[in-house]
Amino acid sequence: TGAKLQRIETRITHFAQGAHVQADGLYLLNGSRHTDLTSVVRHVEHDGATSQLIKGVARDTARGVFQGKIVVERGADGTDARMGHHALIASERAEIDAKPELIIYADDVQCAHGNTVGTLDESALFYMQQRGIPAEEARALLTQAFLIEVIDRIEHEGAREVAREWLTARL
């Protein structure tokens, strides 16, 4: 379900000393859907923290785009900002594009960003099939194992369960 073409833009600014945000997300695209996720987090005060984990899967001819930017302004010393985007391409015609950025104007910070795009591990698929798990079920299980990290970071138990059910229904 969902729109064929969608853009989701998140903008967060840390205006208070010691502000913290966890801005995670996941996407699961199929058909010819195109999703553009844009995230901009600005640290303007000191001792702020950002933790962002985005994971996604593109199947069929779907296209996913992630543009993430963390900006640490002058005077925002003590900032700890982490951004990760990891995606799976689940068909030959699917596409994932990613552009993670860190822009740092302060000196005393701990910041990191990372991006990976790949496919399911063929040896893991083979291993599961050799133990009697059908290929489609093995793909679904490995995809769920890849994405579940984002869901496990949801603090509210009820919301976490709803997200797990949502994911299971779509795999």
Question: Which functions belong to the PLM regions below?
Answer:
Residues 1-126, 130-133, 147, 154-171:
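Conserved beta-strand/loop scaffold segments within soluble protein domains that form the structured core
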